[in-house]
């Protein structure tokens, strides 16, 4: 997997790996500035701040929405990525047009969210930059790398949940602990927006482990993630990779506002002296 981190002006954003189930739960998007070319980010419940993503799965459906646009569904072991290709994505449109499902497909593209005017649900999609046909081995390798990345994010997010730090203080502490800038920026936003619970993190952890077992032929299917990010409350987390994230020290050194000292009772009752 490519190194993670922020991309400065003129630099291409990293294409992250994540499962469709988590991407489908995403409902937060924002831009760092009002500049026309400022990147737009989608923040997932574990705090992944993603502008571009890379996914591999099975194209199960291609359909025409109108005269100019095709919609494709690319399914991984946990759910489906939806992609739209129109006149401004001619190569992707041509690829979808000639693809006969089912077919193993890799997609790199921009993460997007959309909320219809008559709905309170936020839908996610991928605006394709590139599409290519791949094989089952490529899909399996992607599943392993996506699972590893997911488990790492869960471990970082769990450490953040255990800390009293929030907002900019949490972002700074995560960055100083060596967490990549993108995840450090996303985790505080995720906790604030979704109220991500340890029960959700445990469900996502089980999903990632199921995906690994599926690739290893130890399981026939991945159990669904039934919880919303803010549901379920506290839960014990199963095994996670070790992450060197020390937020306790940052919390101890975080400045606190001391209450102003009350004046002594006697002096408070004394009238002010005359000039």
Sequence positions of predicted segments:
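Short nucleic-acid-contacting surface segments enriched for D/E, G, S/T with interspersed K/R
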Residues: 89-108
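Short, glycine/small-residue-enriched coil/turn segments at secondary-structure junctions
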Residues: 43-53
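OB/S1-fold single-stranded nucleic-acid-binding modules
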Residues: 1-42, 202-251, 271
């Amino acid at each position: 997997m490519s190194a993670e981190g922020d991309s400065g002006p003129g630099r291409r954003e990293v294409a992250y790996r994540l499962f469709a189930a988590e991407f489908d739960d995403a409902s937060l998007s924002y831009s760092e500035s009002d500049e026309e070319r400022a990147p737009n980010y989608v923040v997932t419940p574990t705090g992944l701040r993603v502008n571009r993503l890379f996914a591999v799965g099975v194209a199960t459906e291609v359909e025409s929405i109108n005269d100019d646009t095709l919609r494709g569904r690319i399914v991984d072991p946990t759910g489906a990525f939806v992609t739209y290709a129109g006149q401004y994505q001619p190569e992707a449109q041509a690829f979808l047009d000639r693809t006969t499902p089912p077919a193993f497909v890799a997609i790199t593209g921009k993460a997007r969210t959309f909320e219809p005017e008559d709905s309170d649900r936020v839908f996610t999609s991928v605006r394709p930059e590139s599409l290519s046909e791949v094989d089952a081995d490529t899909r399996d390798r992607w599943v392993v790398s996506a699972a590893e990345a997911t488990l790492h994010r869960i471990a970082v997010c769990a450490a953040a949940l255990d800390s009293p730090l929030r907002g900019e203080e949490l972002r700074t502490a995560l960055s100083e602990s060596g967490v990549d800038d993108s995840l450090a920026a996303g985790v505080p936003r995720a906790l604030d927006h979704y109220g991500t619970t340890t029960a959700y993190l445990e469900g996502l952890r089980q999903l990632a482990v199921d995906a690994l077992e599926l690739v290893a032929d130890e399981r026939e299917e991945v159990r669904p993630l039934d919880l919303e990010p803010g549901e379920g409350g506290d839960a014990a987390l199963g095994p996670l990779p070790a992450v060197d994230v020390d937020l306790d020290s940052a919390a101890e050194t975080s400045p606190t506002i001391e209450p102003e000292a009350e004046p002594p009772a006697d002096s408070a009752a004394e009238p002010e002296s005359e000039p």
